[in-house]
C-alpha cells in the first residue's frame, strides 16, 4: 500500500503570507480538527449514528476555501468539513445537522452529507461523488457564458475518479475549456475498496 504514494517531502512556502495570515490559516485548520475530535467522541458514545472523518485532510479543504473567492461555488465531499468552517457556515446549524436536529440544513436527516448552503456557495454533496463533476461543469459553463471570470471547484476522491462520470466531466471541461478546477483527494480507499482493487498502476497519478 505504501507504494501507492510517492515519497516526496512536503515543503511549506510562507512567502507572501504575513504573520496574521498564518495565524488565521492555523485557526482555520484547527477548527475542523476540533469538531472532528468532538464528533468522533460522540460517535463512540452512541450520540450520533455515523461520521465520515476527514482527519489529516483538513489542509486541503481549508486551503481551497481560503483561496477561492467567496462568491464562487465549491462542490465538497463528505470529508471536507473544512470547506464549511472556512466559509463561516454557522456552527450551531452544522452541529444541528450532524446530530439529527430539526435546525439542521435538512432537518438533520442526512447527517454529515447531502447538504449545502447556497448563501455560502457550497453545493450539497452527492453520495456517488462522480455526478458532482458534471454539475460543476454546468456551473463553470454558466460562469463562462455570463463572462463573470469566475470558476467552480469540485472535489472527488480516488474512488470517485474510477466512475464514468469523472471521465465524461473531465472530457467536457477540456473540450469546452470550462473554468472548473477538479481536486482529487487520494486516501487510498474508495469507501472500503483499497487502491489496488481500483486500478492497475504503481501510483494513482499514473492513472
Model-derived segments and spans:
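Conserved acidic/glycine
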Residues: 1-60, 67-68
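A short, structure-level motif marking secondary-structure boundaries and short turns
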Residues: 10-11, 23-24, 153-155, 189-191
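Cofactor-binding active-site loop characterized by glycine-rich and histidine/acidic residues
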Residues: 37, 41, 46-176, 193-206
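Short, ordered loop/turn segments at secondary-structure junctions
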Residues: 79, 185-188
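Active-site flanking residues adjacent to catalytic metal/cofactor-binding acidic residues
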Residues: 157, 184-185
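Short, proline-centered helix/strand-breaking motifs
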Residues: 179-182
